């Protein structure tokens, strides 16, 4: 079942080496108003929970069918009052099962896996690293890895492969053993877990409320099953909420000078251990009523 498929990815113990002292670099200048972009209300998922509010930016460029399914189920109230039935500390929090056991799903047909996407020259993408034969960066707020641009000329559709990276806050779709068995259950990452890359569909990222994701009641056992779990009380697109209740989010634009300064600061702080998961894109949130 869904819970068993994802259960195979058990988080290993994290080992950290000694931290070398570095001279503190001056903080970057504050961002200008033009350094921010507004998230469209039609791409902002508002997840109210028993522990607080989580806001997720949807990424239809990466997984259009999965984003459409999330929007449909949210609009129908399917997710309201469902449990965070499987939560593993230092890994992820899973929900979206009407049975609360890991075995349930919606009445809609299963989805074909969207583990990778095609990136063309017209897709907004901000690279932050260029390991050999690849580019790593962001599509919207979602960290991704893609093939380099110079390969586009040699492909039939003038595009290259890309895939989402499972950094903290990334939203993924749970599934059974088969690749094309995702339906309604999803999970939000509490920490980074690269073993999921290209194995589970990425459809968005938490832009506000990662602290809430990490505060959800976790299981004391390795299977992650939670007794008396926290719940989602209401899940809607911001666009479907009354104007007075609608939160708004301004994200730092990844094409801005302020973002480049943020990346440089993270790279300097981490040195050889730098990862795209070390970059937290700032957000300005107006909560709504």
Annotate each PLM feature.
Residues 21-289:
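Cyclophilin-like peptidyl-prolyl cis-trans isomerases
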Residues 7-17:
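Bacterial N-terminal signal peptides
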Residues 1-7:
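Bacterial N-terminal signal peptides that target proteins for export
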